[in-house]
Structures are given as structure tokens and as C-alpha cells.
UniProtKB/Swiss-Prot annotation:
<dbReference type="Pfam" id="PF00718">
    <property type="entry name" value="Polyoma_coat"/>
</dbReference>
<dbReference type="GO" id="GO:0075513">
    <property type="term" value="P:caveolin-mediated endocytosis of virus by host cell"/>
</dbReference>
<feature type="short sequence motif" description="Bipartite nuclear localization signal">
    <location>
        <begin position="4"/>
        <end position="18"/>
    </location>
</feature>
<keyword id="KW-1015">Disulfide bond</keyword>
<feature type="region of interest" description="C-terminal arm">
    <location>
        <begin position="321"/>
        <end position="383"/>
    </location>
</feature>
<dbReference type="GO" id="GO:0042025">
    <property type="term" value="C:host cell nucleus"/>
</dbReference>
<protein>
    <recommendedName>
        <fullName>Major capsid protein VP1</fullName>
    </recommendedName>
</protein>
<dbReference type="InterPro" id="IPR036931">
    <property type="entry name" value="Polyomavir_VP1_sf"/>
</dbReference>
<keyword id="KW-1164">Virus endocytosis by host</keyword>
<keyword id="KW-0945">Host-virus interaction</keyword>
<dbReference type="GO" id="GO:0005198">
    <property type="term" value="F:structural molecule activity"/>
</dbReference>
<feature type="modified residue" description="Phosphothreonine; by host">
    <location>
        <position position="357"/>
    </location>
</feature>
<keyword id="KW-1166">Caveolin-mediated endocytosis of virus by host</keyword>
<keyword id="KW-0167">Capsid protein</keyword>
<keyword id="KW-1160">Virus entry into host cell</keyword>
<keyword id="KW-1145">T=7 icosahedral capsid protein</keyword>
<keyword id="KW-1048">Host nucleus</keyword>
């Protein structure tokens, strides 16, 4: 009998005793800034860049331009004087304010009734403070150096420095917080906490008061010492900043055209430009200089340059036709101001809603209603 050939199966082979683990599924839809984010748009026109700059708003407006009638202070605040009481009213031209602007883009969607729309998404930004070399000017009519009475160089710009820049698809959300709530700011020319809340500031405004919030919707109107970026909001905006304090702190500033700041979040999605617009804002304070006669100090601000890269992205249409038609009809009606029919002071006594039909009840005095849980309740009349 011929010998049998051995099986070709190796005895060392081990079978998998259990199924191999599979990668956990991840969500494909992402809601960002109130939008359901979908895929990226590909093609030659799907990426664009925009360059812009913002000038500082230190208190002195751009006009008048005459260098003898106030124009010489453009880029500076006017003279800051020490308060004479706890209820000091600072002048508006001594308050550095936020710089902001909106850059508009061409319309991407001709048909707003589609299920999906295209939006610009901010991907990255290159930004730089311009003009730091001007701080080398030490021959101006400023405070003299402490080691030279009326000879040699003057004291350069020094003191507290504050740098913040932001970019996104919506105006920057701000949180109000002040050092002393007893300070009385002027009600015209600037936006204060009282402008928003319609009330005087309280002790909570020296910490975090949830009602003292605003949106940066005006250039040169929101004082830096009052309004700060709100970390609880700004979901569709990115902001970056740093602060260096001190009365004689030397200005420290780095600048380069090779540094890129990525605006994407942990999910790879950047700020979505709603309404075909990109909002930019910044504050760049380099310190202050003291005048020759020691009368006052002037804070110095610098402009900032932006170069933003944007790409197109598909999002689910957040504006259904029903809401568009409803808003159209509502806007056609005249706007009236009548007595309150909703809210705390409502004058509505009773509302009845009927659904379907039922037999006539035997006792018309029985009260029937639907509670907040959707259950039908019957209250029997008392004796």
C-alpha cells in the first residue's frame, strides 16, 4: 500500500478565536456655528486669500487731518490725567477702543432653496503688527532721560502692552468687566455697560456679570478697558492675545511674514462666514509716552495687517423655505407698538385651543385642560 502524503496545512497555524476589533464609527455630520457642516468644495476656485489692515483706534479720531488741529495725535490717545475722585469721568479721546471691519465676498449661492449651500470657511491667517521700528524715535519732545537733563535721548515708549486679534464669520462677542464700577463713563461717543444694560454698573461688573455682554458691531466705539473677548461664546470666531503689565515695561514685539496661525478647531472646521462676510478685529497698544512737562501720558497704538486664507465648504441649508416665506409675510405687515400681550405683563386672560370633536358634556361647569405633560385633566365642580 502506497504511503499517504502529509497534509499541506501547517500545524503551527492558529485560528482566530474571536472577531478582530473594528474601528469605532465617528459622526459624519458636524454642527458648527449653528450650521450642519458637510464636505469641502473642490476645484480651481475653491480657495481664496484676502489681505486687509486695521488702523488703531486710540481715542483720537482720523479727522481732522491738520497736524496743528488734532491730527498730530492720530494713532495716540490724548493726554491721560490722574483721576481726582472715585467717580471720575474719563474723556472719550483718552480711551483706546477696539478696531473692527467686515470684509464682504461675492454671493456663492444663486438659489437659496436648495438643501445645501456653499459658505466660505476661514482656514488660516498671517498677521503682523506694522511699524515697530518707529519706537526707535527718541529725539522727540518727550520726557527727557533720567540721566540726561536736557541733552541726549528722550524716554522711549514704555509701559503696559496689550495685543489681541480676532477673525470669524460673526462679530466678536464681548464680556464687560471694569476695575471700578463707580467710574462714570460718558453715555455718548462710546458703548459702555450702561449702554447695553440700560442700568448703572454694579459690583458684579467688577467680576463676571452674565448680563454685561455685547457684540463688536462698531469700529472705535468699544473701550478696551471695559470690553473683553467672551470665552463662553465666540464659537464661530477665533481670537488670540497677550498682555504685559508694568509702568516701565519695555515693548517686546516679534514680527515675520512666515508665521501662519491655523484657525481650524479640533474637528478640522474653521469659522464659517455667514452672510458672505468675514469679521476682523484687533487691539495693539504698545505703551505710553510722557510729555516733556510731565503733564500727561499718551498711549500708543499700531496698525495690524491680515492675510486670511479661505476655502469653500458645503453646509446644510439652515433657512428652510417655510421660514423664508414666513419672514417675507411678516415683514410686509406694519410694525406696531401696542399694549403687552405676552411676557411678564401680558394682558391675555385665557386661550382656548380646540382639537377635533367630542360629545356634549353633561355638566358645562366641569373644567378640562391638558397639563404640561400632555395628559387630559378634569376638575370636578365643588359643592
Amino acid at each position: 500500500m502506497a504511503p499517504k502524503r502529509k497534509s499541506g496545512v501547517s500545524k503551527c497555524e492558529t485560528k482566530c478565536t474571536k472577531a478582530c476589533p473594528r474601528p469605532a464609527p465617528v459622526p459624519k455630520l458636524l454642527i458648527k456655528g449653528g450650521m450642519e457642516v458637510l464636505d469641502l468644495v473642490t476645484g480651481p476656485d475653491s480657495v481664496t486669500e484676502i489681505e486687509a489692515f486695521l488702523n488703531p483706534r486710540m481715542g483720537q479720531p482720523p479727522t481732522p487731518e491738520s497736524l496743528t488741529e488734532g491730527g498730530q495725535y492720530y494713532g495716540w490717545s490724548r493726554g491721560i490725567n490722574l483721576a481726582t475722585s472715585d467717580t471720575w469721568i474719563p474723556r472719550n479721546n483718552t480711551l483706546p477702543t477696539w478696531s473692527m471691519a467686515k470684509s464682504s465676498f461675492p454671493c456663492l449661492n444663486e438659489d437659496l432653496t436648495c438643501d445645501t449651500l456653499q459658505m466660505w470657511e476661514a482656514v488660516s491667517v498671517k498677521t503682523e503688527v506694522v511699524g515697530s521700528g518707529s519706537l526707535l524715535d527718541v529725539h522727540g519732545f518727550n520726557k527727557t532721560h533720567r540721566f540726561s537733563k536736557h541733552k541726549g535721548n528722550s524716554t522711549p515708549v514704555e509701559g503696559s502692552q496689550y495685543h489681541v486679534f480676532a477673525g470669524g464669520g460673526e462679530p466678536l462677542d464681548l464680556q464687560g468687566l471694569v476695575t471700578d464700577a463707580r467710574t462714570k463713563y460718558k453715555e455718548e461717543g462710546v458703548v459702555t455697560i450702561k449702554t447695553i444694560t440700560k442700568k448703572d454698573m454694579v459690583n458684579k461688573d467688577q467680576v463676571l456679570n452674565p448680563i454685561s455682554k455685547a457684540k463688536l458691531d462698531k469700529d472705535g466705539m468699544y473701550p478696551v478697558e471695559i470690553w473683553h473677548p467672551d470665552p463662553a461664546k465666540n464659537e464661530n470666531t477665533r481670537y488670540f492675545g497677550n498682555y504685559t503689565g508694568g509702568t516701565t515695561a519695555p515693548p517686546v514685539l516679534q514680527f515675520t511674514n512666515t508665521l501662519t496661525t491655523v484657525l481650524l478647531d479640533e474637528n478640522g472646521v474653521g469659522p464659517l462666514c455667514k452672510g458672505e462676510g468675514l469679521y476682523l478685529s484687533c487691539v495693539d497698544i504698545m505703551g505710553w509716552r510722557v510729555t516733556r512737562n510731565y503733564v500727561s501720558s499718551l498711549e500708543k497704538g499700531f496698525p495690524r495687517y491680515f492675510k486670511i486664507t479661505l476655502r469653500k465648504r458645503w453646509v446644510k441649508n439652515p433657512y428652510p423655505m417655510a421660514s423664508l416665506i414666513s419672514s417675507l409675510f411678516n415683514n410686509m405687515l406694519p410694525q406696531v407698538q401696542g399694549q403687552p400681550m405676552e411676557g411678564e405683563n401680558t394682558q391675555v386672560e385665557e386661550v382656548r385651543v380646540y382639537d377635533g370633536t367630542e360629545p356634549v358634556p353633561g355638566d358645562p361647569d366641569m373644567t378640562r385642560y391638558v397639563d404640561r405633560f400632555g395628559k387630559t385633566k378634569t376638575v370636578f365642580p365643588g359643592n
